[in-house]
């Protein structure tokens, strides 16, 4: 009986550790996903950049929609500084029909996304990263050819009202990296809609 309890506890601990997700300082998981233009985009495509702003987002979530223009602005303001945005839709479109590839393509065209919008069809990427909400940001830093997590969490400190933002977490983290410092804070709580997963 004690053995069974111990085995169950150990299995639970392993599952919890596997689901803990990436933390600042961890190596980022490589990915290769289909963009709305039909081409595959890989993390390795950005090996010449200083970093990548990976944003797990989606179509219907009110929080994701509230952040849409801010995500576009991040790309426009920081892509030329070596930190482009890569957006990834992690939702299972059988559960969230607004997140089909066709709907993603439609939205990207309508909103004029200047960055890739990728579909995590198998949902392996968001699970590997540990994303829980949309939007959920993983700011990656290129460390000698290896992408490491420099910051993870929210874009800023006011999800629904941009005019009331007082702290821009992602921008501050990028500025810290550009000045040779470590982001502080390096993690915050991502506020948004829970990712829709079949499992």
Predicted regions span which residues?
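N-terminal "domain-start" segment that seeds a small globular fold
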Residues: 18-44
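Loop/turn elements at helix/coil->beta-strand transitions in domains of secreted/extracellular proteins
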Residues: 49-52, 80-85, 112-116, 134
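Thiol-/selenol-based redox modules, centered on thioredoxin-like
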Residues: 139-199
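Structural microenvironment flanking redox-active thiols in thiol-disulfide oxidoreductases
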Residues: 65-110, 121-128
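Short, thiol/selenol-centered motifs that function as redox-active sites or metal-ligating centers
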Residues: 58-67, 137, 193-196
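Short active-site neighborhood of thiol/selenol oxidoreductases, capturing the structured segment around
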Residues: 44-62, 174
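Short, internal strand/loop/helix patches
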Residues: 105-146
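Bacterial Sec-dependent N-terminal signal peptides
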Residues: 1-23
């Amino acid at each position: 009986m004690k053995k069974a309890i111990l085995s169950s506890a150990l299995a639970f601990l392993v599952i919890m550790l596997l689901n803990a997700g990436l933390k600042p300082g961890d190596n980022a998981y490589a990915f290769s996903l289909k963009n709305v233009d039909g081409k595959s985009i890989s993390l390795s495509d950005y090996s010449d950049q200083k970093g990548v702003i990976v944003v797990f987002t989606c179509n219907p979530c009110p929080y994701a929609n509230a952040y849409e223009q801010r995500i576009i602005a991040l790309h426009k303001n920081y892509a030329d500084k070596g930190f482009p945005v890569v957006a990834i839709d992690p939702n299972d479109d059988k559960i969230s029909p607004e997140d089909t590839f066709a709907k993603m393509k439609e939205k990207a065209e309508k909103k004029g996304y200047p960055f890739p919008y990728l579909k995590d069809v198998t949902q392996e990427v968001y699970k590997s990263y540990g994303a829980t909400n949309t939007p959920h940001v993983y700011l990656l830093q290129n460390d000698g050819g290896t992408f490491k997590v420099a910051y993870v969490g929210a874009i800023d400190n006011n999800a629904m009202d941009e005019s009331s933002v007082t702290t821009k977490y992602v921008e501050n983290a990028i500025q810290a990296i550009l000045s040779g410092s470590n982001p502080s804070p390096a993690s915050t709580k991502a506020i948004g809609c829970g990712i829709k997963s079949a499992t």
